[in-house]
Each structure stands twice: as C-alpha cells, then as structure tokens.
Amino acid sequence: MSAVVQQQGDLLLNLYIQPKASRDQIVGLHGDELKVAITAPPIDGKANAHLSKYLAKAFKVPKSDVYIIKGELGRHKQIRIVTPKLIPPEVSELLE
C-alpha cells in the first residue's frame, strides 16, 4: 500500500510519526509511509491530539474530519482526512 491514497474525495494517509521533534512538519517518505514530525511527546495521547490538530490545519479541515483509523498507540498510523480543502505539496506529489 502506498503512503497516500485518495478514496472517494477523502485521503488515506499511512504515517510514521516522530514525536518530540524540534518543529511540526511533513518530512517526506519513510519507506512506504509518509513521515510526520511533531513537537508533542508521546504521553497520555498528547501526540495524537497534536497530530490531529496539525493535520487539520495543514489540510484546512476541522479536527473532527481527521480520524486515526489504525495505530492509536504506535508510531505507525493510518489516518483518514475527510474531503480536504487543501493538499500540501509534500502530499500531492505522492498521490497516484
């Protein structure tokens, strides 16, 4: 499976998360996943909440439209973004 898949207007992202980074950013490909660095530590769900907020801002959607499908407790996550208003260039170049 590829890092980014478009499904009926939604985006399905396979992510590798790097918590406690110096800044929030979409880094690029990491194997067959998209690497995302976030500043939040992986404690008490802070990283997941921060990731959802960061992705919502990057794709111009409400936080309620960002779903963690798989990987709630790990670094490897599958995320669904419902009808993104904007697709960051790092992601659009990976679309099939």
From Swiss-Prot:
Disulfide bonds: none annotated. It holds the Pfam family DUF167. Coiled coil: none annotated. GO terms for cellular component: cytoplasm. HAMAP family: UPF0235. Belongs to the UPF0235 family. This is UPF0235 protein Sputw3181_1321. It comes from Shewanella sp. (strain W3-18-1). The lineage of its organism: Bacteria, Pseudomonadati, Pseudomonadota, Gammaproteobacteria, Alteromonadales.
